[in-house]
Amino acid sequence: MRQTENTAIVLRYANYRDHDRMLTLLSPTRGRMEVLSRGCRRPRSPLLNASELFALGDFQLYIKQERATLVSANLLETFYLLRADFDRLAVGVYLLNLAEAAAQPGQNCQELFLLLLHTLSRLTFSDQEWKPLLAGFLLHYAAAGGYKPRLMHCVTCGRRMTPQERAWFDLGEGGLSCEGCHARQAVPLAPEQVRWMRRSLMGGASTWVNDEEAYAPYVLLRDFVERRLERPLRSAAMLPK
C-alpha cells in the first residue's frame, strides 16, 4: 500500500443528524482526528463505504477553525471479510478501540498505524489463530506505548534469567520475576510462554503463532495492557472466549 499524508483508517463512527456521521480516524502523521462526513448515510452517497468501521483510504479533508469535514475519499481496503466471522470481527473492533485509546490528536502515530494495519490484514486474510495474533498485537502495542514488558532480567534483583528457569510475571512492575523475588500476586509462566513473548517481540505479525515450543500468554497480556488504559473498553466484553 502506498501511504500518503491523507491516508487514514476509520476507528469509530457516530450517527449525526439524519444523514451524517462523525468519524474518528487514525492517521499515521496526524494522529487521532474527528471528522464530519456529511450526507454519508444517504444510499447513493460517494462517502458511504468510506464512513464505515475499518475503512482504510486516502481522505481529502476541508479544515476550518480546527473542524474537519470529509470532502472525498479514495477507498483502499474495507476488511469486509471480517464481517463473515463474528469472533474475528469482535477482535477487529477491539483492535480499533485499543488504537483509539493510544492515539492523540496531532501526534505521529506511524508505528501504531502500521501495527494496526498489519494485524488487521492477518486477522482478515489469513487463517492464523486469533488468540496468539491478538497477544502479539498487545505485546507490540505495549512497546509502542512506552511500557514494553521486561523479559530478559528479573524486575526486582536485575539478574539475567535463563531460558530454563521458572518465571513469574509481575503486572505492576511490568516484567519477569525470578523464583526468589516474585511477589505473591505475580502470575506464574511456563517456559514456553516466556519463549513466545521473547520471540514475538522480535518478529512481525506472521510469527505470532502457537506451537509446541512456544505459546502465547493471551490472558496475561490482555490484563497487562487493559489495566494501563485510562478507561475500560466496552468491546473487551464482546471478545470470544
Question: Predicted regions: what is each one?
Answer:
Residues 1-22, 26-241:
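Non-catalytic alpha-helical scaffolds and adjoining flexible linkers that form interface surfaces
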